[in-house]
Amino acid sequence: MSDRILVLVRHGQSEWNLKNLFTGWRDPDLTEQGVSEAKRAGALLKAEGLKFDVAFTSDLTRAQKTLGLILGEMGQEGVPTTRNVALNERDYGDLAGLNKDDARAKWGDDQVHIWRRSYDIAPPGGESLRDTVARTLPYYVQEILPCVLRGQTTLVAAHGNSLRALIMTLEKLSPEGIMKRELNTGAPIVYKLAADSTVAEKRDLVA
């Protein structure tokens, strides 16, 4: 049986990350730094000798482009890829497009902190992390995990909060634990899964 390898990568820096804006389902492109981060992720994964069988990404440009740059850097452009809205970033609703400092000025530091860092309180018109988990986790269980358990080396390029939903499940973290987890842009996390889908090994790849 082949190793059951799952790699998670948060997209490279986007134009709105750089401008300190709430992004959510809005669709900014990568910055030059974001492109470099994605290529560096590809180089790190290539150095590991990984050959991907399948890949998954969201419906948003920054994640799709990150995936394409990673696979291009690895010389694996032909990997079958599935795009799905289930892997989209958390929807920030009325906060989307706002500068985070401006949002704090409008609603107050405490309220914005609650929206950003509580598990189950959503901003106006948006999703909480719990809502994001409810959207993302079934897709992981039904579509992504079966590929990994079949021995297909699997790459997921997505977003900070949709990946938090997967990491929470993989690492059996509490809501409080996952809210504290910071994911760097363009930094691959490599999981080796046991036959029962638990994590046998985890490594963070850094340049």
Swiss-Prot record:
<feature type="binding site">
    <location>
        <begin position="10"/>
        <end position="17"/>
    </location>
    <ligand>
        <name>substrate</name>
    </ligand>
</feature>
<feature type="binding site">
    <location>
        <begin position="160"/>
        <end position="161"/>
    </location>
    <ligand>
        <name>substrate</name>
    </ligand>
</feature>
<dbReference type="InterPro" id="IPR013078">
    <property type="entry name" value="His_Pase_superF_clade-1"/>
</dbReference>
<dbReference type="InterPro" id="IPR029033">
    <property type="entry name" value="His_PPase_superfam"/>
</dbReference>
<keyword id="KW-0312">Gluconeogenesis</keyword>
<dbReference type="GO" id="GO:0004619">
    <property type="term" value="F:phosphoglycerate mutase activity"/>
</dbReference>
<feature type="site" description="Transition state stabilizer">
    <location>
        <position position="159"/>
    </location>
</feature>
<keyword id="KW-0413">Isomerase</keyword>
<comment type="similarity">
    <text>Belongs to the phosphoglycerate mutase family. BPG-dependent PGAM subfamily.</text>
</comment>
<feature type="binding site">
    <location>
        <position position="62"/>
    </location>
    <ligand>
        <name>substrate</name>
    </ligand>
</feature>
<feature type="active site" description="Proton donor/acceptor">
    <location>
        <position position="89"/>
    </location>
</feature>
<protein>
    <recommendedName>
        <fullName>2,3-bisphosphoglycerate-dependent phosphoglycerate mutase</fullName>
        <ecNumber>5.4.2.11</ecNumber>
    </recommendedName>
</protein>
<keyword id="KW-0324">Glycolysis</keyword>
<dbReference type="InterPro" id="IPR005952">
    <property type="entry name" value="Phosphogly_mut1"/>
</dbReference>
<dbReference type="GO" id="GO:0006094">
    <property type="term" value="P:gluconeogenesis"/>
</dbReference>
<feature type="binding site">
    <location>
        <begin position="116"/>
        <end position="117"/>
    </location>
    <ligand>
        <name>substrate</name>
    </ligand>
</feature>
<dbReference type="InterPro" id="IPR001345">
    <property type="entry name" value="PG/BPGM_mutase_AS"/>
</dbReference>
<dbReference type="Pfam" id="PF00300">
    <property type="entry name" value="His_Phos_1"/>
</dbReference>
<feature type="active site" description="Tele-phosphohistidine intermediate">
    <location>
        <position position="11"/>
    </location>
</feature>
<feature type="binding site">
    <location>
        <begin position="23"/>
        <end position="24"/>
    </location>
    <ligand>
        <name>substrate</name>
    </ligand>
</feature>
<feature type="binding site">
    <location>
        <begin position="89"/>
        <end position="92"/>
    </location>
    <ligand>
        <name>substrate</name>
    </ligand>
</feature>
<comment type="function">
    <text>Catalyzes the interconversion of 2-phosphoglycerate and 3-phosphoglycerate.</text>
</comment>
<dbReference type="GO" id="GO:0006096">
    <property type="term" value="P:glycolytic process"/>
</dbReference>
<comment type="pathway">
    <text>Carbohydrate degradation; glycolysis; pyruvate from D-glyceraldehyde 3-phosphate: step 3/5.</text>
</comment>
<comment type="subunit">
    <text>Homodimer.</text>
</comment>
<feature type="binding site">
    <location>
        <position position="100"/>
    </location>
    <ligand>
        <name>substrate</name>
    </ligand>
</feature>
